[in-house]
Amino acid sequence: MLKLFLNAGFYILLFVSCNKTDANTDPSSTGSVIADPKAIEVLFIGNSLTYTNDLPALLTNHAKSRQILIRTSTIAFPNYALLDHLSENNITMAMSKTKFKYIIVQQGPSSQAEGRAWLIEGATKLKALANKNGASLCIFMVWPAYSNYSNFDGVIKNHTDAASMTNSILCPVGMAWKEYIDRTNDLSYYGPDLFHPSPKGSQVAAEIIFKSLFK
């Protein structure tokens, strides 16, 4: 949902995920990294569904297991919609410093009309930014809280539409979650609050995102 205010205790989660053999870090400087020039740069933009279990690091590690070197940066706040990110300058600052190949964007479930509108408007604006910077926009399809499981089809449709309308790459994580849960009645992709992902759920997300990017 769109934020109404930014509590002083909130902060941007902007970090780089890479294997220690791939980069040298200065511990006194957040995000100061000398990257392997062969690494594929990936920017994640989202909220707690992205930073729970450190999804960017899981993607980095999964890619490395497939002999692909990537370097991820993340901009994420609790409860942020894409339009919240666009109202600030963190994205443009990140793009001014790094040539990203992929920009992976994530909003909440967005199953209802208002969330759908925010998702499509945000994706449209971010697509323009991605195009301007020579990057491919990727829509990370999430999932609803289990208490709203009946809204899952709306989540899938609205993310699919957002990707289609913006000619972006769809990362159909939510679709895979639903297929698995419907088939097995196993809720282990969900964490204890039955909304945020478990480590298993985040690992599945990383693998699906990888397949979507590197078909």
Tell me what each language-model feature is:
Residues 1-4, 19:
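Positively charged n-region of N-terminal signal peptides that target proteins for export
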Residues 7-16:
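Bacterial N-terminal signal peptides
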Residues 16-38:
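Bacterial Sec-dependent N-terminal signal peptides
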Residues 29-31, 88-91, 156-157:
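A generic local structural motif
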Residues 37, 65-67, 132, 165:
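Short, well-ordered coil/turn elements that cap or connect secondary structure elements
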Residues 40-43, 49-121:
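Conserved SGNH/GDSL esterase-like catalytic core that processes O-acyl groups on lipids
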Residues 62-65, 208-215:
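Active-site catalytic microenvironments for nucleophilic, acid-base chemistry
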Residues 92-199, 203, 207, 211:
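Alpha-helical cap/lid subdomain in secreted, periplasmic
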